[in-house]
Amino acid sequence: MDDASKDYLESLPELHSGETFCFDCNPEVPCFNQCCAELTLPLTPYDVLRLRRHMDNIASETFLANFTTMRSFPDTGFPLPMLRMLQGPGEPCPFVTPAGCSVYENRPGACRFYPLGRGTKMGKHGIEERFFLVQEPHCHGFDKGTERTAEQWLHNEELSEYNAANDRYMRLMALVRATGKPLEPRMATMAVLCLFQLDKFRELISQMHIFAHVDVPAARQTSIMADSLDGDKAALDFALDWMELIIFGQSSQLSKK
């Protein structure tokens, strides 16, 4: 998360553990779909993984070229693909339709969180999180909403896998941030391939015989190379380990042979 995003979250009312809010979003709400336009929406590796699978496993190169604008985190140099809005009136999200989200089952984590914001930081005992309530002037979802806690909202929106994958990515970036130096361009390019282009990463694994150089159980190797949603999850998990290893020469989860 960049400084501007942190400042924005800090300006919002915090929703403490056990506190409730009332919100619903559906076609009956007058503002339905209005929040799905003119977005500044960064995509995480797990977001891209899920969206590509929804789109019949479209090639990663095609997905990134057609749907994103690639930027980078200034403090770490890690890639930061932004979902590209359509040109034209209102600049709508490329996945929104009059009936709602066309990728709803695999929509990005930020969309699932709304109207909550999640702030995280590395604490002594792991990831520490705080939740904030985003109340925009155009939104009528709060008018007659269902009462819930932040924890209930996360459960209903099936955010556990998103958070787990995104927190792993955040930990890797935190390690790089602690060095005070962003990734070199060559390593940043490798991060795009390994984290956002899992199809290309599998090709790299085969071409470079990576499994011959690191200690990966046979069952995990099979999972990583499987062309499936679960295989993609395993590949991303390994990619995060691999990036840590090649950046720092060691990894807490992966060792050289």
Model-assigned labels for residue ranges:
Residues M1-Q34, T40-L49, R53-H54, I58-E61, ...:
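Short loop/turn segments that flank or connect secondary-structure elements
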